UniProtKB/Swiss-Prot annotation:
Entry keywords, A to Z: Cytoplasm, NAD, NADP, Oxidoreductase
Stated family: Belongs to the D-isomer specific 2-hydroxyacid dehydrogenase family. GhrA subfamily.
Active site per the UniProt annotation: R227, H275
Gene that this polypeptide is encoded by: ghrA
Organism whose genome encodes this protein: Escherichia coli O127:H6 (strain E2348/69 / EPEC)
Broad class of where this protein is predominantly found: cytoplasm
Protein name: Glyoxylate/hydroxypyruvate reductase A
Length: 312
């Protein structure tokens, strides 16, 4: 069994050694331009077209939860990967836990009004504020995939009213499910906190725009953990300036790194992190990949395969 590996920033030698330990029968090599030797599996992130084109691979593993970069490259270069080759993404591998930590910490930050107290502190103003009540602090999750379900589970511990919206209806205990565009307005109408965990598809690009934000309750909060292209940043800034949206926590942006001149940096109601909400944990990723390859070799059914038509 031959495995080729390509990632522009990961420690390639660490991955090769870890994969050797996890799959002793495999020959693992770092792919370099000009390498046209045969391979059974490819582990990639932002791969060059020539790495995958023309290969009779058993499967390709994207080394992250998102596959929009490889799918967009496939649209431009359909010869890059045969339609018969399954594409897998890292469904969790520790990312769910990281998303839980991020979401819970920020929801509690807003619920306890720490954002308001920070603004008061900046002006040396001492003033206790009325508390928020859980029953009025409904949390809505846009996107009901693996990571969305993990975030919902973690927030249930805090007894917030929860709802989710997705393409198809879900049956999550304790979570009110909304499905399809026809139910989006009803979903948004009660969301005091909107958490975005949607996949990046042509249908979801720019979905968080003026029209969507206007359907939220006054003084709502936005937490974007998915992709920057989901948010029309000018519309969000306008909603923040008007008070329609009281605060935003943003981990992803249309341009990354976020340009220094972006008004988001200095906005008093915006908190920024540099795309770190959930990163690939190498040891857990190697464990997932090795188990999945073992299942594929046995002809077993596996999880995590990307539906190229849907984009996730």
């Amino acid at each position: 069994m031959d495995i080729i590996f390509y990632h522009p920033t990961f420690d390639t030698q660490w991955w090769i050694e870890a994969l050797h330990k996890a799959i002793p029968q495999a020959r693992v090599r770092a792919w370099k331009s000009g390498d046209n030797e045969s391979a059974d599996y490819a582990l990639v992130w932002h791969p060059p077209v020539e790495m995958l084109a023309g290969r009779d691979l058993k499967a390709v593993f994207a080394l992250g939860a998102g596959v929009d970069s490889i799918l967009s490259k496939l649209q431009a270069h359909p010869e890059m990967l045969k339609p018969s080759v399954p594409l897998f993404r890292l469904e969790d591998t520790g990312m769910g836990e990281q998303m839980q930590e991020y979401a819970v910490s920020q929801v509690l930050h807003w619920f306890r009004r720490f954002d308001d107290y920070r603004i008061q502190q900046n002006s040396s103003h001492w003033q206790p504020l009325p508390e928020y009540h859980r029953e009025d602090f409904t949390i809505g999750i846009l996107g009901a995939g693996v990571l969305g379900s993990k975030v919902a589970q973690s927030l249930q511990t805090w007894r917030f009213p929860l709802r989710c919206w997705s393409r198809t209806r879900k049956s999550w205990p304790g979570v009110q499910s909304f499905a399809g565009r026809e139910e989006l307005s009803a979903f948004l109408s009660q969301c005091r906190v909107l958490i975005n965990l949607l996949p990046n598809t042509p249908e979801t690009v720019g979905i968080i725009n003026q029209q969507l934000l206007e359907k939220l309750p006054d003084g709502a909060y936005l937490l974007n953990l998915a992709r920057g292209v989901h948010v029309v940043e000018d519309d969000l800034l306008a909603a923040l300036d008007s008070g329609k949206v009281k605060g935003a926590m943003l981990d992803v942006f249309n341009r990354e790194p976020l340009p220094p001149e972006s008004p988001l940096w200095q906005h008093p109601r915006v908190t920024i992190t540099p795309h770190v909400a959930a990163i690939t944990r190498p040891a857990e990723a190697v464990d997932y990949i090795s188990r999945t390859i073992a299942q594929l070799e046995k002809g077993e059914r596996v999880c995590g395969q990307v539906d190229r038509a849907r984009g996730y």
